[in-house]
């Protein structure tokens, strides 16, 4: 019976540690992505609660949307010339 309690609390501890780790890695704004993950030559972007590196082929976002997001504006189109409007 004692071993069942120890196993239960060990399992509970591991589950709670896993949940804390998942929520710590989430981002809500671009500032949460500073100094996270692998090296990236440009500022990381928070996209769908995950930090991504918008560089080259690593990102599926068009460069125009990334530029507008850094300016805190909304992208008008994804093509050149890039147009941004206020949100």
Swiss-Prot record:
Subcellular location: Secreted
Signal peptide: 1-19
GO cellular component assignments: extracellular region
Domain of life (superkingdom): Eukaryota
Keyword Metal-binding: no
Family according to the record: Belongs to the DEFL family.
Protein's name in the database: Putative defensin-like protein 304
Organism: Arabidopsis thaliana
């Amino acid at each position: 019976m004692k071993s069942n309690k120890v196993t239960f609390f060990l399992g509970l501890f591991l589950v709670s540690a896993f949940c804390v780790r998942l929520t710590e890695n989430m981002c809500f704004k671009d500032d949460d992505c500073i100094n996270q993950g692998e090296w990236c030559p440009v500022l990381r972007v928070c996209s769908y609660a995950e930090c991504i590196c918008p560089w080259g082929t690593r990102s599926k976002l068009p460069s125009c949307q990334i530029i507008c997001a850094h300016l805190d504006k909304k992208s008008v189109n994804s093509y050149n010339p890039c147009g941004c409007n206020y949100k």
